[in-house]
């Protein structure tokens, strides 16, 4: 997905340039095809749009042990919440946590985040 590249710039095999202004419709069409997975890497803007449109089947987040204090938002700012479940986590030697999440399709319930704490203070470790 790009607003600046030309189709001639794409040299990867089995790659297709999608104009940014039609990205959601193009992703819907690609998901309807037979074939492999679709991966998005490094585009917070596109990821945010796909999450808001419920077009994400899996979210792989790398959590760095660094606080930047700012940056691009990954999650939609549309006022609605999406519930994800942690499927797996791996800790790299550098301290980076690699977390795989999948949407549950469940609505956020009042007090939902409170369920993460058994005693109201310490987080419950997912099994």
What do the PLM-derived regions correspond to, one by one?
Residues 1-55, 65-127:
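Portal/gating segments that form or line small-molecule/metal binding sites
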